[in-house]
């Protein structure tokens, strides 16, 4: 109990604890016997004003995560429990070589202060809890008494006002975590909840490129211009997907699928696109479906690849091991992102490393830990390997560029202006706007941004539909990248040998033939080119939406383009 060591109420306990630690330091050779006896004889001196000292001693989110990572590695190395490992770290005289970039950490902390809600709008709602802490904003009745509810079992429930939170983390392409902030506003406690490092959330559509699309390209099942139908994979009359709202309202939830076949209205088409539409039954090139984050297109790619193949890749190769092997091996989880627990922002950012050159490296917060004599005590246990071929990685890089640079992209025009450097990204929205994401990459860094409530809650209940958008996460990422990259020299993404640009027919998706009146340019693996189109086309062809050009201007109005 920390109250036992309150220096104002129990100073004798604190002196005893201090002297016990000093004795251990002497016994372990950290200090001499003379130093121990001199220090143990000193009285306890309390400062009159400790507020500034307490504030300055609050550790950053990065330091908190670093502490936990090193403690975990000591536990594994020495075979000791957590308390022993913590004591070893406190008293062992170790030097930790951290991966943090101080300038980037400071810039991220300043942005995540979110002064005047500059980046993340404040949404508040009442949350029912069984106890209230000193940090909670308790809901009171008009007469000044706490708002409560008593359950049937006698449990008293209280209410607190909670606001939207956010997290951000940046890595380089060697897995080094460079900056991390796990909450909005000023940090007031050390080792507080770190939403960037230790909290899992549903991924929404951010899982589409690292799973279905990447493997579809890797396996040669689809390419840049593969034409896919913008319609549900399953129709209502197929009786595959239950309409749970209908079943719930009509008392059918307990029925088996066989019994439910007698109720045609108990089924629905699936999936829907963001906003509730089922598509227009048109054929669209793959790049367009990814840029617009159309569920109807992604689910067809995922169906070709297979949910189990996607799960095995993201779980084992990309180390998203907080996914659930018993409940997440399905298209809804692996393509739509509605997982049981989800993943942390740090793990998701690490997964997007593969769109640089195909390499994956385990994210880590330190390189080495040295003992007091300068000997290596720990080295980070990260692993690095080729998760995708460089060719697939580069095609995916170009595809994800369209999210930011194409007029139809879900984050159209919101790329950072950093000395002409390119970027890629993917938006993501979990069901009912409970989790909003953006993961973005530049030639230097990859960053994940999450926004939502700590306890998942539909953000449109407290913010307008126009406010609860992924563009909030994109805008924060854009501002942060422009700050940390402003003095960096121009750097391109590494182009892969074996990837070629080719003109394709916008009607067939095949390489453009002499009779194709409408063409666009795509990126293809040289060993997996489409056939050449030899169709006979009608003369009245409308120009199709175009992918991002090498130099793209920002659309005049992008306010209505968020679709995911």
Regions found by a protein language model. Name each.
Residues 1, 68-76, 170-186, 217-221, ...:
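Glycine-rich, acidic and aromatic/proline-enriched surface loops and short helix-turn segments
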Residues 1-106, 110, 178, 320-321, ...:
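Non-catalytic, structured segments within soluble enzyme domains
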Residues 2-12, 21-22, 26, 48-56, ...:
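Second-shell loop/turn segments in exported
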Residues 13-26, 38, 57, 61, ...:
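Extracytoplasmic/secreted proteins, especially bacterial periplasmic and envelope-associated proteins
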Residues 52-55, 221-310, 331, 372-402:
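Conserved catalytic neighborhood of penicillin-recognizing serine enzymes
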Residues 98-170, 177-182, 186-202, 207, ...:
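A penicillin-recognizing enzyme superfamily signal
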Residues 126-158, 237-280, 324, 458-468:
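Surface-exposed intrinsically disordered loops and tails
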Residues 311, 316-345:
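Primarily short, surface-exposed interaction patches in extracytoplasmic proteins
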């Amino acid at each position: 109990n920390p109250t036992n060591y309150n220096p104002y109420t129990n100073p004798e306990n604190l002196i005893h604890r201090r002297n016990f630690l000093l004795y251990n330091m002497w016994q372990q050779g950290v200090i001499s016997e003379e130093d121990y006896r001199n220090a143990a004889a000193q009285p306890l001196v309390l400062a009159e004003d400790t507020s500034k000292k307490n504030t300055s001693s609050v550790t950053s989110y990065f330091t908190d995560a670093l502490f936990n990572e090193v403690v975990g590695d000591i536990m594994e190395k020495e075979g000791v429990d957590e308390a022993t490992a913590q004591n070893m770290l406190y008293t062992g005289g170790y030097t930790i070589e951290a991966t943090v970039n101080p300038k980037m950490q400071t810039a991220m902390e300043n942005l995540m202060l979110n002064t005047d809600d500059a980046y993340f709008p404040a949404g508040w709602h009442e949350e029912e809890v069984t106890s209230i802490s000193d940090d909670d904003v308790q809901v009171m009745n008009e007469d000044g008494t706490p708002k409560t509810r008593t359950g049937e079992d006698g449990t008293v429930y209280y209410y607190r006002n909670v606001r939207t939170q956010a997290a951000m983390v940046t890595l380089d392409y060697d897995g080094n975590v460079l900056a991390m902030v796990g909450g909005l506003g000023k940090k007031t406690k050390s080792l507080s909840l770190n939403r960037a490092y230790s909290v899992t959330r549903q991924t929404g559509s951010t899982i589409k490129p690292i799973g279905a699309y990447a493997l579809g390209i890797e396996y040669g099942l689809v390419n840049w211009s593969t034409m896919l139908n913008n319609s549900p994979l399953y129709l209502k009359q197929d009786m595959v997907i239950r309409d749970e709202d209908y079943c719930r309202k009509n008392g059918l939830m307990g029925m088996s699928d066989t019994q439910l076949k007698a109720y045609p209205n108990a089924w629905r088409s699936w999936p829907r696109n963001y906003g509730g539409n089922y598509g227009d039954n048109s054929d669209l090139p793959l790049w367009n479906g990814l840029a617009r984050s159309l569920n109807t297109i992604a689910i067809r790619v995922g169906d070709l690849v297979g949910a189990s193949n996607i799960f095995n890749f993201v779980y084992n190769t990309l180390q998203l091991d907080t996914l659930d092997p018993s409940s997440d091996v399905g298209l809804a989880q692996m393509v739509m992102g509605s997982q049981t627990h989800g993943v942390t922002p740090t793990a998701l950012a690490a997964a997007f490393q593969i769109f640089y050159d195909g390499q994956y490296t385990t994210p880590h917060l330190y390189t080495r830990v040295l003992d007091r004599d300068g000997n290596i005590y720990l080295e980070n246990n990260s692993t690095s390997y080729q998760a995708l071929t460089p060719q697939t990685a580069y095609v995916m890089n170009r595809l994800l560029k369209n999210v930011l640079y194409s007029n139809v992209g879900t984050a159209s025009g919101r790329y950072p202006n950093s000395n002409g450097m390119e970027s890629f990204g993917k938006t993501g929205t979990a069901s009912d706007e409970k989790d909003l994401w953006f993961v973005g990459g530049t030639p230097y860094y990859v960053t994940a941004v999450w926004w939502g409530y700590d306890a998942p809650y539909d953000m449109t209940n407290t913010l307008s539909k126009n406010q609860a958008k992924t563009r909030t996460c994109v805008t924060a990422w854009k501002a942060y990248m422009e700050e940390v990259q402003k003095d960096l020299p121009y750097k391109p993404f590494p182009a892969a040998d074996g990837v070629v640009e080719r003109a394709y027919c916008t009607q067939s998706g095949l390489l453009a033939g002499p009779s194709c009146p409408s063409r666009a340019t795509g990126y293809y693996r040289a060993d997996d080119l489409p056939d050449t189109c030899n169709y006979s086309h009608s003369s009245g062809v409308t120009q199709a939406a175009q992918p991002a050009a090498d130099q793209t201007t920002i659309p005049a109005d992008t306010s209505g383009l968020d679709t995911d």
